C-alpha cells in the first residue's frame, strides 16, 4: 500500500522574517505526513521510504504545485505576493524535464516563476558541480529565484558562488556556530561578504 493510502500529505508554510526590519519577506514550504490519529511525521521519517521507491520527485512536484495553487488564490484575493521557497531533491535535479515540468505547473496556476524560490542543496551525491552550475543557469534563465542551502557542507566555494547569481545563500549552521570563535572561519566569511 502506498503512503497516500494510510497518511495524509500536508504542506505548511514557515515564515521567513527579515532580521533587520522584522518584516515578513517570504516563506518556505514544508511537507509533513499525518496519520488518522493526527500524528505528524517529519521528512526524516518518510523520505528514506520514498527514496527506496524512487518517489521523491513526485513529492517535490506535489509541494511545488500546492504552493502555486496557494499563490494563485492569494492573487485572486488581491493579496501581496512574496516568494515561497520549495526544496528540490537531487532526484529532481537530474531530471531533464525539470524546467519544463515546473513551468507547466506555473502556467496551470498563472503563477510567475519570480514568485517561486527553488532551494537547492549543494550537498548532493548524484550531481557534479558542473551539472549544478548548468542547472542553476537554466532555472535562472526561466526567471526562477534560486536559494543555495547548506553552504559550506560540500563543494560550495567562491568559484561556485561567482559562477551563479543566487538570490539567497543559506549558510550551514556549523559555520555560523564557528563565527567569532574561529578566526579562519571569520576571515573566510568576511571575504565572502566582500564579494
Question: Over which residues does each language-model region extend?
Answer:
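Active-site core of bacterial EAL-family cyclic-dinucleotide phosphodiesterase domains
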Residues: 1, 5-49, 87, 148
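Catalytic-site/binding-pocket detector for metal-dependent nucleotidyl cyclases
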Residues: 8, 54-55
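Catalytic core of bacterial c-di-GMP phosphodiesterases, primarily the EAL and HD-GYP domains
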Residues: 23-28, 55-132
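Cyclic nucleotide signaling catalytic output domains
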Residues: 45, 49, 66, 87-88, ...
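Conserved long alpha-helical elements within nucleotide-processing catalytic cores of c-di-GMP signaling
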Residues: 47-48, 57, 137
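The catalytic core of metal-dependent phosphodiesterases that act on cyclic dinucleotides
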Residues: 105-179
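Conserved adenylation A10 loop of the ANL superfamily
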Residues: 190
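A short, hydrophobic C-terminal helix/tail in secreted or cell-surface proteins
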Residues: 194-195
Amino acid at each position: 500500500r502506498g503512503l497516500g493510502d494510510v497518511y495524509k500529505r500536508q504542506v505548511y508554510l514557515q515564515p521567513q522574517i527579515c532580521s533587520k526590519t522584522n518584516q515578513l519577506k517570504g516563506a518556505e514550504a514544508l511537507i509533513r505526513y499525518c496519520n488518522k490519529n493526527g500524528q505528524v511525521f517529519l521528512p526524516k521519517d518518510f523520505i528514506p521510504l520514498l527514496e527506496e521507491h524512487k518517489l521523491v520527485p513526485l513529492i517535490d512536484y506535489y509541494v511545488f504545485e500546492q504552493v502555486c495553487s496557494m499563490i494563485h488564490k492569494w492573487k485572486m484575493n488581491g493579496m501581496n505576493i512574496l516568494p515561497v521557497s520549495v526544496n528540490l531533491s537531487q532526484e529532481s535535479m537530474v531530471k531533464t524535464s525539470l524546467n519544463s515540468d515546473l513551468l507547466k505547473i506555473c502556467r496551470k496556476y498563472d503563477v510567475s516563476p519570480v514568485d517561486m524560490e527553488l532551494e537547492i542543496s549543494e550537498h548532493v551525491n548524484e550531481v557534479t558541480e558542473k551539472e549544478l552550475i548548468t542547472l542553476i543557469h537554466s532555472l535562472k534563465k526561466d526567471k526562477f529565484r534560486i536559494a543555495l542551502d547548506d553552504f559550506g557542507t560540500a563543494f560550495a566555494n567562491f568559484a561556485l558562488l561567482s559562477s551563479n547569481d543566487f538570490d539567497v545563500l543559506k549558510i550551514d549552521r556549523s559555520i555560523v556556530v564557528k563565527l567569532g570563535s574561529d578566526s579562519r572561519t571569520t576571515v573566510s566569511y568576511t571575504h565572502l561578504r566582500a564579494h
